[in-house]
């Protein structure tokens, strides 16, 4: 969606500017209405007579018009709803109130959103707004004007719920059973979303006799989506609590199946909703193409989820078959993927241990050990097939004559992919870039989003960006740091965190204006007294020091005779 990507990347319209403009318009409209009522007393009597003669409100909703027609508030509401301009001001004020409530709830629950979460939420919100506009063009098209406002109110409630649900689902991906302090607010928010979804369903069941069956089915589709998503959030909060932290493998298994079933059911409901809108749209027009396109998107999402599930199943079977399940000897050791206590884990050939599900998610992205980057066999190597090159369509014309003109026979071959012809591959879309960005951020949360996105646009692959980070070509790296900062930091880390039985070898530079001292691993150090993490950290420090000394920035050190 080019329009959605353009709006989501631009700084306008921002929420602050929209709220300021809405407050200004609401103040001007309120002053105008109250001035009109004060300057024209006969207007109140006219509206009162009009309300008493309006039998539609009393018959449809059972309101006591005789008692309500004398109240000034009810008269002002009727005056606003009867005016074409003021009714849109009222609807816009309603949307502004929902936006303020959404921001307050997000502020109280999550405090501040990450930049990536804000961008993804902004793009999802604009997608929902575009879908709602097309949705209303089909639903409200053949109906009268007084039916517009209920549909707009319903669309605002659905947008309010879907935005909170989307942000909560994004945050729940990073919730761990170890952090129970921040998850309490998310639990209260999940209960609020669940009860609002149930209230929406109850409200539609009460007023469905005022609607025909086609709009009622569409409203029930919205209710089902809200209920399924709220139920998913509620169960995720329950499973992430400390009550079930004693069995993390069962919790991960439950969360995986819960997310898979919820996503599949929600995509199916959305596809059925688009199919109904396509069936009852007024003729074949652009909206029909729009609904067909989104039906194809939802179908592709469902097939991708099933394909991803089959791949995960193969990887999990490979893990259970190839790597033994062991009990961690040290109760304080943690998995380097999720940073939870190891407990029962899987041991790789390089002797590193990880949880079953952590190892499965890792092998789905990379066929190497998360700690030492040692290559390990994975079924993903067989699943990943190189893209077929050379797919083409061949058109054959046998020739012929038209009057006195003779056309020779020729063959036209059209290639399916013009990327190699122009010397470059197809650039990834924004959706693919966001997916790859999430994969890289799961492994390197400390990295800046801008740095990762810049490298992804150049490499076009999450695997290439991960290798660039690990090999030090981007990010906070030794080869990009000044010499003084690097030496001082490595000296502090070596002296504070690594202790050896024997004295460490101290290397000093000659007296040429500066003097540096750093700690180096001794060949006779007692590694048995150090933890595995400390040993690997010391090796990593030596590796990066060696890389720095081999770089161009260390030419002055090599000239002094310092080569290791």
From Swiss-Prot:
One GO BP: multicellular organism growth
GO molecular function terms listed in the Swiss-Prot or TrEMBL record: ubiquitin binding; ubiquitin protein ligase activity; zinc ion binding
Protein source organism: Caenorhabditis elegans
Residues linked to a glycan: 53
Subcellular location: Membrane
SMART domains, alphabetized: CUE, RING
Classification lineage: Eukaryota, Metazoa, Ecdysozoa, Nematoda, Chromadorea
Positions annotated as zinc finger (RING-type): 335-373
A Pfam family the protein falls into: CUE
Entry keywords, A to Z: Glycoprotein, Membrane, Metal-binding, Transmembrane, Transmembrane helix, Zinc, Zinc-finger
InterPro entries in the record: CUE, Znf_RING, Znf_RING/FYVE/PHD
Keyword tRNA processing: no
Name of this protein: E3 ubiquitin-protein ligase hrd-like protein 1
PROSITE patterns: CUE (PS51140), ZF_RING_2 (PS50089)
A cellular component annotation (GO) from this entry: cytosol
Role of this protein: Proposed to have a role in neuroprotection.
Transmembrane stretches, start-end: 17-37, 61-81, 86-106, 123-143, 148-168, 185-205, 215-235, 272-292
């Amino acid at each position: 969606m080019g329009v959605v990507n353009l709006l989501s990347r631009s700084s306008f319209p921002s929420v602050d500017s929209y709220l300021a403009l809405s407050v200004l318009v609401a103040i001007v409209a309120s002053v105008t209405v109250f001035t009109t009522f004060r300057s024209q007393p006969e207007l109140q009597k006219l509206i009162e007579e009009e309300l008493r003669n309006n039998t539609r409100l009393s018959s449809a909703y059972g309101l006591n018009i005789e008692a309500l027609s004398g109240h000034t508030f009810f008269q002002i509401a009727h005056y606003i709803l009867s005016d074409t301009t003021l009714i849109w001001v009222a609807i816009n004020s309603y949307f502004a109130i929902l936006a303020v409530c959404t921001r307050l709830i997000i502020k109280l629950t999550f405090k501040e959103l990450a930049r990536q979460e804000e961008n993804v939420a902004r793009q999802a919100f604009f997608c929902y707004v575009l879908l709602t506009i097309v949705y209303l063009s089909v639903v409200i098209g053949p109906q009268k004007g007084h039916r517009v406002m209920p549909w707009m109110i319903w669309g605002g409630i659905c947008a309010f719920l879907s935005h909170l649900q989307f942000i909560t689902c994004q945050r729940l991906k990073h919730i761990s059973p170890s952090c129970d302090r921040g998850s309490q607010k998310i639990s209260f928010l999940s209960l609020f979303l669940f009860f609002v979804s149930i209230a929406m369903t109850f409200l539609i069941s009460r007023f469905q006799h005022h609607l025909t069956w086609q709009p009622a089915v569409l409203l029930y589709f919205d209710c089902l989506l809200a209920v399924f998503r709220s139920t998913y959030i509620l169960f995720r909060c329950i499973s992430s609590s400390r009550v079930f932290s004693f069995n993390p493998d069962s919790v991960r298994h439950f969360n995986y199946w819960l997310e898979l079933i919820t996503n599949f059911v929600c995509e199916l409901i959305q596809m059925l909703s688009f199919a109904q809108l396509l069936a009852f749209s007024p003729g074949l027009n652009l909206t029909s193409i729009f609904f067909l396109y989104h039906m194809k998107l939802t179908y592709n999402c469902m097939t991708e989820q099933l394909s991803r599930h089959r791949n995960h199943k193969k990887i999990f079977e490979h893990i259970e078959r190839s790597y033994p399940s062991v009990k961690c000897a040290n109760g304080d050791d943690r998995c380097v993927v999720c940073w939870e206590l190891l407990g029962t884990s899987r041991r790789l050939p390089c002797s590193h241990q990880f949880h079953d599900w952590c190892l499965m998610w890792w092998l789905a992205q990379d066929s190497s050990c998360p700690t030492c980057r040692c290559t390990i066999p994975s079924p993903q190597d067989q699943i990943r097939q190189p893209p077929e090159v050379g797919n083409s369509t061949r058109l054959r014309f046998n020739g012929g004559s038209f009057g006195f003109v003779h056309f020779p026979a020729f063959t036209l071959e059209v290639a399916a992919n013009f990327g190699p012809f122009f010397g470059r591959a197809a650039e990834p879309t924004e959706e693919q870039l966001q997916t790859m960005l999430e994969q890289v951020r799961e492994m390197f949360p400390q990295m800046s989003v801008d740095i990762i996105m810049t490298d992804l646009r150049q490499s076009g692959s999450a695997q290439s960006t991960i290798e660039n980070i690990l090999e030090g070509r981007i990010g906070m790296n030794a080869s990009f740091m000044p010499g003084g900062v690097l030496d001082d930091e490595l000296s502090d880390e070596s002296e504070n965190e690594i202790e050896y039985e024997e004295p460490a070898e101290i290397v000093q530079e000659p007296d040429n204006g500066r003097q540096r001292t750093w700690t180096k691993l001794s060949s006779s150090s007692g590694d048995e007294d150090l933890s595995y993490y400390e040993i690997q950290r010391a090796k990593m420090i030596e590796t990066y020091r060696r890389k720095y000394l081999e770089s161009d920035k260390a030419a002055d050190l090599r000239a002094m005779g310092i080569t290791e």
